[in-house]
């Protein structure tokens, strides 16, 4: 009310008038202002590309081999652009991997701390892009604000900061495939252990990586209900999610 206030932005930790500061692609902590990680994952992926087993059967990473640089405004040819043409399963995994670096460096007992994260590109938007489409698809929602899988992954990872306050779980993707499909199933959860069930039969516990990612390899598709159950350190169920096979459209 008395003036002297300013909004924050990236690289403003040394500006006393800023209300917050942030970083792009770097891990940092602040002594004076709340410090938010902002652009820790620049990868891109279309919402309609589920995985390689789903229509339109987009091969993960397939697309352009050049893009226009936002810094030089020149086309960079013959570059590896796979990171900007993800399917949703690999896009979700990449977001988990990138955020884990920041979560691992979360606040301790010192006087320089990190205050969490924000998504600088929350929804797909008409800013500089690197994928085959002519707009940026780094968002956790598409341009119509329809959530992608990383939206739900962030709900899991961001429910609390120093420690998880409410255990959550999310099964990546859907459960509608051809009968001969055998594929990995990915689950994002803050639980200590995750067990997968298919039509009530246990498929065992997932391999845990990057704290939040659980992988179940070579799961053969069978129509019905796919359930993921998360357990706390005492072995008690703390969260549950399910996917149900949909019928064929009429």
PLM ranges: what are they?
Residues 221-225:
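Extracellular Ig-like/FN3 beta-sandwich strand-entry sites
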Residues 235-247:
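Edge beta-strands of extracellular beta-sandwich domains
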Residues 203-210:
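Short beta-strand segments within Ig-like beta-sandwich modules, predominantly Fibronectin type-III
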Residues 213-219:
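Exposed aromatic-hydrophobic patches
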Residues 179-186:
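Short coil/turn motif common to extracellular beta-sandwich-like domains
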Residues 187-193:
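Short proline/glycine-enriched turn/loop motifs at strand-loop junctions of beta-rich domains
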Residues 1-157, 161-178, 215:
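Substrate-binding/catalytic cleft of secreted carbohydrate-active enzymes
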């Amino acid at each position: 009310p008395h003036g002297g206030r300013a909004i924050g932005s990236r690289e403003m930790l040394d500006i006393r008038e800023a209300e917050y500061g942030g970083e792009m692609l770097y891990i940092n902590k602040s002594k004076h202002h709340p410090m938010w990680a902002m652009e820790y994952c620049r990868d891109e992926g279309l919402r309609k590309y589920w995985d390689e087993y789903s229509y339109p059967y987009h091969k993960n990473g397939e697309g352009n081999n050049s893009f226009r640089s936002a810094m030089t405004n020149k086309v960079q040819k013959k570059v590896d652009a796979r990171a900007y043409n993800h399917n949703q399963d690999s896009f979700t995994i990449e977001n988990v991997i990138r955020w884990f670096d920041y979560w691992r460096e979360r606040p301790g007992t010192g006087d320089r701390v990190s205050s969490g994260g924000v998504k600088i590109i929350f929804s797909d938007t008409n800013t500089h892009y690197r994928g085959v489409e002519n707009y940026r698809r780094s968002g956790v929602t598409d341009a119509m604000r329809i959530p992608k899988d990383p939206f739900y992954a962030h709900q899991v990872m961001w429910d609390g900061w120093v420690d998880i306050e409410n255990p959550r779980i999310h099964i990546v993707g859907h459960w509608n495939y051809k009968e001969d499909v055998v594929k990995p199933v990915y689950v994002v959860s803050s639980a200590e252990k995750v067990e997968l069930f298919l039509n009530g039969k246990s498929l065992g516990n997932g391999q845990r990586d990057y704290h939040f990612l659980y992988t179940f390899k070579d799961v053969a598709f069978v129509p019905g209900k796919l359930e993921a159950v998360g357990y706390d350190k005492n072995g008690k169920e703390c969260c549950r999610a399910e996917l149900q096979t949909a019928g064929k459209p009429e």
